[in-house]
Amino acid sequence: SNVLVENSQLTNALGNCLSVDGGNVTVNSSTIAQFYPFDALRASALDFSGFTHPLVSFKMKNSIVTGYSEDEIMGLKPADGSENAFNYDFANCIIRTPEVDDKEKAHYTDVVFEDVKDTVNYGHKHFVLVDADMQRYDFHLRKESAAIDKANVQTSTKHDHDGRERGDKPDVGAYEYITNKE
């Protein structure tokens, strides 16, 4: 199957916020955040796999993948001996996963790996409001977010999730930073 996810907010699920098992999938200018408050055994923000079906292409561009866990991305390669494809690329993204080793780096272009110890610019601090106690969330960007002005102007969508123009310096994720939003 062919799937295009653009300007989308996929957040706070008990299971994975986005799960891909094979296909030809592009995710662009989206926010995928796992801040589900009711179960410590919640799944990851993003799970992609070529285990059951060939992952012909998984491309994530100009997107944020974050959450409570130190690793919010799970990639499952096909079993040894399988002929299933497992093709993936991340570009101009901010992702909460440990930095990859040299043999994996070819799959990551202009990607920021979140520093889980940075409590100012990453994780829930990207966003205007993450209040698990009151179950109130606003995934628009805060002025401290590392996502501001970091998207690729050539590949980012021209408008954000709210229909606002992204301009010459688009932000990573589903929403453009708005000065008066906070």
What are these regions (language model features)?
Residues N2-D138:
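Predominantly extracellular beta-rich ligand-binding scaffolds that present long acidic/polar faces
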Residues Q135-E182:
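Surface beta-loop-beta hairpin patches that serve as ligand-binding interfaces in beta-rich domains
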